[in-house]
A protein has these predicted regions:
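Conserved Walker B catalytic segment
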Residues: 1-15
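Interdomain motor-coupling "hinge/lid" segment immediately C-terminal to the ATP-binding subdomain
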Residues: 10-12, 18-20, 24-158
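Conserved catalytic cores of phosphodiester-cleaving nucleases, focusing on short active-site segments
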Residues: 14, 255, 274-293, 312
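Hydrophobic/aromatic beta-strand patches that form the interior of the parallel beta-sheet core
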Residues: 15, 49-51, 216, 264, ...
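Short beta->alpha connector loops
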Residues: 19-22, 34, 197, 268-270, ...
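Active-site regions of enzymes building and remodeling cell-envelope glycoconjugates
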Residues: 50, 323-338
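Accessory nucleic acid-recognition modules appended to NTPase machines
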Residues: 103, 107-274, 278
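Catalytic cores of nucleic-acid endonucleases
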Residues: 291-329
Length: 341
């Protein structure tokens, strides 16, 4: 199709959408047969620019959800607390986003109808479509193992130690049996991966542990539906067991959309962990996510107190403010955290 347009004399901009799963899988198969340098034969090299399409982030959701509130949101910067009326309104919008996630059809349905049942139905349909794609394109990767990994996200994140454990997939499961399935899901952008760093040391890429990581879902709303968490629990119960992982998934989703680079986490052992770590230039930014039961904050606070990093962030439901050695940033500002440093 692209070649037909490019071979003519008509000059126009063409926008095409797709998962590229067929291209990726086809390329992988040719690479095995023709060597690692094999390219998809039908790909119009040099004629297209690729853009990654993500679920709507919170700012995009807010723009559709409440245009007037979004206009105020766009003006927020610095570390001064927000007026309480705006803080409460933005928390309400954040709660709605945690329920819907950022899949456009789901967001549109919620804004038009505000029907939790319809939201859940649409999300289950999307989950089923993703699983159908896995069966369709899984091929030599073993679709069954890909599905096992994808369906394990909720129990994996529900563990006290959220690190991905192969043995939790099924009895006797080994890394070499499922590594390819995980790489397929990451490449297809169905899951998000955060690697552990063994030291808080620049550059983080040099201390990244390739065999220690957490897997999160593409979209927080789909993860919530997979976990069968009703909207009422999100609003009325601030401390149910899965609230923490759900909020972490939300924060990771927003951070990855900021373009600030790879998001990692730090863990010396299960009880000594910093939720996320960003490298901004040469600065290491420790991040605490306070979403549910507070299990790991001691490590974050100790690091901030002893190392005195230039930037340190705690995301929570509290208002924007400087709090000792770190900045408390409301969860609804995660997508624009850099404006608050």
């Amino acid at each position: 199709m692209f070649l037909k347009f490019s071979s003519g004399t008509v000059h126009m901009a063409i926008v095409a959408g797709g998962s590229l799963l067929g291209v990726k899988i086809g390329s992988a198969k040719r690479s095995r047969m023709e060597g690692d340098g094999a390219k998809p034969k039908s790909y119009p090299v040099g004629k297209v620019d690729l853009l990654d399409v993500e679920p709507m982030d919170f700012a995009e959701f807010l723009r559709a959800f409440d245009g007037a509130l979004f206009e105020y949101y766009e003006t927020i910067s610095g570390q001064e607390p927000l007026p309480d009326i705006f803080h409460r309104k933005l928390l309400d919008a954040y709660d709605a986003y945690l329920f819907t996630g950022g899949m456009p059809e789901v967001v549109d349905s919620y804004i038009r109808n505000c029907d939790p049942e319809e939201v859940g139905r649409l999300q289950r349909d999307l989950i089923a479509l993703y699983e159908d794609d896995i069966v369709k394109y899984g091929g030599e990767v073993n679709a069954g193992r890909v599905l096992v990994v994808l369906r394990s996200l909720v129990p994996q994140l529900s563990k006290e130690n959220e690190k991905f454990i192969y043995g939790a997939l099924r009895e006797g499961a080994r890394g070499r049996d499922y590594e390819e399935a995980i790489e397929w899901l990451v490449s297809a952008r169905m899951v998000r991966r955060a690697y552990n760093v063994k030291e808080m040391k620049f550059p983080l890429s040099a201390v990244e542990m390739q065999n220690a990581f957490k897997l999160y879902h593409l979209d927080v709303g789909l993860l919530r539906e997979l976990a069968a968490v009703p909207q009422s629990e999100l609003v009325l119960n601030s401390d149910f067991d899965f609230k923490g992982p759900l909020v972490e998934n939300y924060v990771l989703q927003q951070l990855q959309n900021t373009g600030q680079g790879e998001v990692r986490y730090f863990a010396e052992r299960a009880d000594r962990e910093i939720d996320f770590v960003l490298q901004v230039g040469a600065e290491l930014v420790p991040i605490e996510v306070k979403g549910g039961k507070d299990k790991k904050a001691a490590t974050f606070k100790t690091y901030v107190k002893t190392k005195k990093p230039k930037f340190a962030i705690r995301f929570s439901r509290m208002n924007l403010r400087k709090d000792g050695g770190f900045v408390n940033i409301p969860l609804y500002l995660a997508i624009k955290f850099d404006k608050c440093l």
